[in-house]
């Protein structure tokens, strides 16, 4: 299952990268993130592996993040893994002009279990809406004066 989203950001690409590249900021635009722990490699660099723990209501879950590509300041790719799916995310930051950057996110889910192969695609709208909310929170954070 694939989808792509775009969001214009009213800041320079360098400012966007600086905010995006700081894992402490991730907790601001992903408020359900409660812990980010790098287990191997250099955080944010290709080959780095981290465990991200989220809490949503009474439910707590973890994802393994593997950084697959980094080209500062225009691209950052990761794969998130759990027992149900691998989720590849390609983030690209394109200069529109000096103070505007377009954030493109290309997402692909590869479902692992039989049940998720059947029901996962029916949840595409939910995945898109959740991603749009996260992107919008990042926009509000990074554009704050």
Please give the residue ranges for each predicted region.
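A generic structural signal for beta-strand entry/edge sites
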Residues: 2, 73-75, 98-102
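Amphipathic alpha-helical segments that line or abut small-molecule/effector binding pockets
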Residues: 14-17, 132, 136
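Beta-strand/loop substructures that line and gate deep hydrophobic ligand-binding cavities in soluble
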Residues: 81-133
